[in-house]
UniProtKB/Swiss-Prot annotation:
The gene is SIGE. The keyword Magnesium does not apply. Residues 67-78 have a biased composition (Basic residues). Keywords: Chloroplast, DNA-binding, Mitochondrion, Plastid, Sigma factor, Transcription, Transcription regulation, Transit peptide. It comes from Arabidopsis thaliana. GO terms for cellular component: chloroplast; mitochondrion. This is RNA polymerase sigma factor sigE, chloroplastic/mitochondrial. One of its GO terms (biological process) is cellular response to salt stress. InterPro entries: RNA_pol_sigma-70_dom, RNA_pol_sigma70, RNA_pol_sigma70_r2, RNA_pol_sigma70_r3, RNA_pol_sigma70_r4, RNA_pol_sigma_r2, RNA_pol_sigma_r3/r4-like, Sigma-70_RNA_pol_init_factors.
Amino acid sequence: MGVVSISSSAARSPLGLGNDLLTHRSSLKKPSIVAFKADDSSNSALIIPPREQVLIPAEKHNEKKREVTRRKPCKTPKKPLSLEHNSAPSCSLGVDYNEAAARLESIYKLSPATTTLVEDDVEDGGSKAKVSRRRKRKESGEEKKVVVRNNVKKEKRMSLDKRIALKRNVQEKPVVASVDKKVTKRQQEEEKIERLVRDYSASNDIVSLDWKKMKIPPVLSSTEHAWLFKLMQPMKALLEVKDVLQKSLGREPREAEIAGEINMTAGEVKKKIEIGRAARNKLIKHNLRLVLFVMNKYFHEFTNGPKFQDLCQAGMRGLITAIDRFEPKRKFRLSTYGLFWIRHAIIRSMTTSNFTRVPFGLESVRVEIYKAKTELWFEMGRPPTEDEVVERLKITPERYREVLRAAKPVLSLNSKHSVTQEEFINGITDVDGVGANNSRQPALLRLALDDVLDSLKPKESLVIRQRYGLDGKGDRTLGEIAGNLNISREMVRKHEVKALMKLKHQARVDYLRQYIV
């Protein structure tokens, strides 16, 4: 399709074409004729200006011009428009240029419509090309097979050399790991032994233990017991060798002599003995509960007495004997084996420490009598008689009385009462030394007694007067006194105990003694 236009200005070009496509520019200031021809094919044709003049209103021309400006710029055709001078009509000097210019101007004004057609054709061609491309893509996509791949990739098989090297490494690693484990176990055991020697190397101070207030360490596990007794075995062997050498030499052997006897160095002998003593001290310290258990079970009557500390010390000696003589190979428990030796040591201490020597057999029978009395009391709900105890133990009555007579506690006259804290010797009165001449009149004694009672608190004085009949109305029970004073019986008993303790004060006793002696 071709376009022909005539322009009177040099800068104006038809259809927005550049100056390089202008076919002819006249040097005169007259309109020039330019001819365009796109192609010689059948689809292209030369536009010939019509002979009739077409008038187009200015408004329509402006609207069409705006449409052209709003639309996208026209794409250039694939083949550039060629200019042919031969196809252009020849012009002569006899042509009316004004008329030709007017006609061409009217044709030019119609040119935007033609351009829009061209642009629409180009755009339609582009859209068709895009549609064809999409169809080709779809057809090509349909031909391809859809393959779903797994995200987990399979490992490739290694080469033969790599497999052989890997197998060698796997075989060598367990050997190295076992060696490392042995080294770490040895190091841990050595550190544990060093800690044991550092903490328990000092011997236990048996005498200074306070069995009522001290905190006993927790009981050890069976594995810990076995490990400690294992550490004690070399020390026991060395001590046996030491005893043999001491008997043969007649003196205490040195460490070098003991080491030469068993083919060891003096340092090794010293280290073995230190480790064994530390293990022994730890076993003693962590099994002190056995001593208290035996005291509470078999010697309950001595737990609150003055002999409690002494008996606990004796039980501790029995525990040490049990630890020294214990044999782990027999698979017995230390608690079962140690109970016998602890009880035996306590009973032996009780028989040897008494002021009057009591045979060991009598002391063991006394323990059995006490146990039988306790069992019968729980069974019958009352204190058992002598015949019932004898029948339970199957002993003669004479043996029973002999044991009780020998088991009576022997107290010193200078020992103090548990409640009043007064010596027993102060309660003994020399009746033979009191004569009639040294006696005082009852009135003076009564006044002195009133003075002493008045020095007490009012309630304490009333309780003593009513309790012992000093008010002239006879002795009264705790219930009667409680009713008179409007207090409980327990409070009456407390007032009585406090008053008696105050009356036994040395100053009050001396004041009353001068009226008695």
